[in-house]
Amino acid sequence: MLQERFGDLTIGDLKRRVLIPTVNYSKGSGHFFKTPHAPLFYLDYKHRLVDVGLATAAAPTYFPLHQIGEEGVYADGGLVGNSPGLFGLHEAQHVLKVPRKPGSARVLAIGTMTLGATKRGASGLDWGILHWRKALSDLVISS
C-alpha cells in the first residue's frame, strides 16, 4: 500500500518540514528522519518515504524490522518517543529558533490510548508486579 501511494518519493520531495522518529536497532540509538530544513540536516533527504514509513511503523510483534540500505535495521519510532510532536516543538525552538512565546508554534497531537488502558482516580495506585504484569503491556502498546 505504501509503495502504491508514495512510489519513489523521498523525504527531499516533501513540501512541509517533517521529523519522523525511529530506532536504529543496528546502532542502538534513536534516529529522527528529517527534511533538509536546516543546514545540518543533509543526510535523510534521499530516503524513500516507503522505507521511512516501514521503519517508523516496525512495532515489535506487529510488523517486521525494516532495513534501509547499509545504514541499519530500524524499529518502531514509538520506542524512542511516543509523542513526536514534542520532538517537533523542541526542533522548532532550538534548531529553527522559533520564539518561545504563546502562539509562536502549534502542535496537533492525536492520541491513541484505548479506554481500557487508562487509569482514573487516586485509589489503587500501588498495584505491584502482579497487576502491572498485564497493565504495563496495555499501557505501552496503547500510549
Feature map (PLM): residue ranges:
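Conserved catalytic cores and adjacent C-terminal regulatory segments
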Residues: 1-143
